[in-house]
């Protein structure tokens, strides 16, 4: 099938390879996913090389040795660039992962490594919190990452049974966290897990009290915002003459005009845009609450420009897609920060202190609405806050408004 993609001796080796059918199936999958021909060609040549490596050692698939694969990749990537090394590792992974139909998993990031002894404990716990506490899938992944890290620490300390965990282990792990934010996050995760495990009779109910509870102050940091002129500059600097630019502009406009969270922009679907009624009707990822927004002309123009002349052809209903094969939605771990950072770089704000992700637009919009006199309830409705208490934090930035209601020193002295 791919004979004309090889030349000379390699063409004959490909035709006689015991893995030819495997290469044909996965190569066809890459064609269907619209990978660039040059990328497919690189993969095919690496698959042939790896196939020869297997034949020389009398190895068959899927029974391959992990150490052998690591040694092979170590030799292949020893004198190559970082980008070339990534391609080689991806080629081998795809070749090994593919099934009889040429389908393979697209790996995004490295999954957390859960120690063998802890896996049978973690699985029922995650099932419990997802079933009885309504834990979102993304939060469950964070729980997995944190608890697996704790289990790895325990294993390193020679502990592979829950009933051998001591308060000293908990405190040492907690204190090794890099800063206060991870500590608080790990602390709450561990306390919930310890309470559940104690209910199963696997450890003492007092262990959760060993997790430190540092004093926490609300509103310690001011929300980070841009000036309106800066917002306009960021949007105006996007090159909308390209499909990628039209996509990025639509993402930025949604964040700037509605203050939408990155997760809600990432998972916006075509079905949630009501063109006839001129509104966007979505369900928020973070809290599951519905949010209805008017489809502003500027937003409608940005979306239609992207959808009609920019979005890759796809049957997927998610609005925003990656513009490299396989042209799929962004991964759930992707908060679209690269789009915002590139936009800030174009106007010389790449090194600004503070936030540089899409949340910067969300905070800016909230503060601006407050400055023009919008009530907290109205702002909370626009931002999709479940409580105005969350919105209240933005009052600390609206200095002019606070100044108008400030009590003078003379009034205090009286």
Task: State where each predicted segment sits.
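Conserved catalytic core of the tyrosine transesterase superfamily
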Residues: 1-414
């Amino acid at each position: 099938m791919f004979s004309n993609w090889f030349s000379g001796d390699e063409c004959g080796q490909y035709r006689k390879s015991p893995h030819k059918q495997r290469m044909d199936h996965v190569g066809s999958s890459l064609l269907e996913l619209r990978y660039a021909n040059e990328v497919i060609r690189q993969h095919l040549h690496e698959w042939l090389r790896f196939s020869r490596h297997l034949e020389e050692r009398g190895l068959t698939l899927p029974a391959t040795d992990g150490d052998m694969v690591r040694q092979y990749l170590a030799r292949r990537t020893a004198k190559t660039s970082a980008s070339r090394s990534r391609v080689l590792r991806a080629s081998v992974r795809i070749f090994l992962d593919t099934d009889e139909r040429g389908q393979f998993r697209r790996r995004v990031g490295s999954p957390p490594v859960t120690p063998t002894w802890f896996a049978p404990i973690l699985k029922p716990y995650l099932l419990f919190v997802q079933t009885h506490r309504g834990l979102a899938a993304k939060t469950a992944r964070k729980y997995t990452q944190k608890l697996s890290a704790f289990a790895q620490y325990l294993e390193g300390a020679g502990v592979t049974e829950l009933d051998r965990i001591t308060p000293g282990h908990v405190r040492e792990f907690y204190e090794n966290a890099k800063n206060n934010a991870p500590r608080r996050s790990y602390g709450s995760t561990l306390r919930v897990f310890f309470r559940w495990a104690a209910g199963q009779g696997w450890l003492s109910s007092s262990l959760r009290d060993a997790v430190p509870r540092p004093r926490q102050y609300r509103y310690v940091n001011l929300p980070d915002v841009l000036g309106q002129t800066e917002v306009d500059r960021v949007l105006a600097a996007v090159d909308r003459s390209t499909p990628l630019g039209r996509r990025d502009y639509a993402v930025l406009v949604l964040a700037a005009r509605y203050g939408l969270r990155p997760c809600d922009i990432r998972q916006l679907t075509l079905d949630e845009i009501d063109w006839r009624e001129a509104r966007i009707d979505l369900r928020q990822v973070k809290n599951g609450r519905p949010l209805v927004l008017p489809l502003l002309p500027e937003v409608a123009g940005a979306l239609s420009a992207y959808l009609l002349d920019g979005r890759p052809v796809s049957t997927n209903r998610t609005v925003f897609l990656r513009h490299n094969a396989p042209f799929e939605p962004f991964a759930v771990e992707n908060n679209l920060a690269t789009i915002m950072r590139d936009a800030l770089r174009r106007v010389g704000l790449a090194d600004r202190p503070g936030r540089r992700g899409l949340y910067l637009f969300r905070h800016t919009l909230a503060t601006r609405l407050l400055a023009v006199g919008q009530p907290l309830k109205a702002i909370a409705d626009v931002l999709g806050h479940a409580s105005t208490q969350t919105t209240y934090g933005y009052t600390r930035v609206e200095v002019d408004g606070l100044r108008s209601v400030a009590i003078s020193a003379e009034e205090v002295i009286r």
